[in-house]
Amino acid sequence: MNAPAVPPAPAAARRSKAPLGVKITGTGSCLPATPLTNAHLEKVMETSDEWIVQRTGIHSRYRIDPARGESTHTLAAEALRRALAAAGLSATDLDLIIVATMTPEMSCPATACRVAADVGASRAGAFDLNAACSGFVFGLNTAHDLIKGGAYRRIAVVGADCLSTLMDYSTAGRGTAIIFGDAAGAAIVEACDDPGKGILAQSMHCDGDGWKEIYVPECERDFPEGVACDPSKYGHVQMNGAAVFKFAVGTFSDLIQETLDAAGVTATDLDMLVCHQSNMRILQSARERFGLPEEKLYVNIDRVGNTVGASVPLCLDELRRAGRIAPGQKVMFVAFGGGLTWGSSLWQL
């Protein structure tokens, strides 16, 4: 019997000198190969392109194909490879990998550990974070503060979700199946010597009593009090659409204002608002409340749907590749989701 391979020695535990600033040095993203259009959904459930677009603004989303080897961890790994390339780094340069996901393929190990193996990050620590759609923003705040405190110098934050694995693609499940898509996005966060770079204000919130508005039951005890157990719903996202919409509309704008106030800036100081892509009406409502021009609120929900924890980093990567964000700008990231959770991160890039 062969002895197990001895892994490379990890980076020595230490408390390094705290940096003056923190910066995002690279981004990457990955979509599955197969788009899932409204026209396709019309063939498998009672719905229409017009009905979907009017209510969500979504024309298409992407769905993994396991036969192609696509999964949460493979999308996450590819997004991270692209982020490392953009930052001019190798995987062995990483100190830590944080993967925000609510669709791990296994209970153990963490998706982050499989991502570390796939990319060759032999010296990095790794763990998962589950805050649903808020996950990447929570991870970004966590990475920033770990670096700011001097514990680490270079962290990868990945948001990856494949909600297609939790969907019921029949008329019974159309309330959620029309909304969600699969994707992954990643950002490299590093220490720097510029004190002007990093988070100006951040927040992370939870209303645990709202858990029953978005949940995935696995057995009888997982259903909220007063809701009859239905085994056909096991493993499928259950969402109270009206309650979630009301929560999002009320919370979204308040969260943005709270973050602006904490940083001592106004909406006109923002160069870009990068929001979780949940619903076109919610996005436009927030933009109008703060008087932002269309070019300062990025939108891709029409092309990719609601990609949950991948939503914000996917937007960030598309903006970077299009040259629409640059060092020195103020960019706010905002997200909300199951839990109920919501959070923000206002950066001086």
Where are these regions (language model features)?
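Flexible, glycine-rich active-site loops centered on histidine and acidic residues
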Residues: K148-A183
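Anion-binding (especially nucleotide phosphate/pyrophosphate-binding) glycine-rich loop
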Residues: A86-S122
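Acidic-glycine-rich active-site phosphate/pyrophosphate-binding loop
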Residues: M45-Q54, M106-G120, V157-L166, R221-C229, ...
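Short beta-strand segments
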Residues: T25-G28, A100, N130, I155-D161, ...
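Condensing-enzyme catalytic core mediating Claisen C-C bond formation in acyl metabolism
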Residues: N2-R68, T171-K246, G250, D254
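Buried hydrophobic positions in well-ordered alpha/beta secondary-structure cores of metabolic enzymes
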Residues: I24-G26, I52, A83, L94-I97, ...
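Short glycine-rich phosphate-binding loop at a beta-alpha junction
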Residues: T92-A100, A267-H276
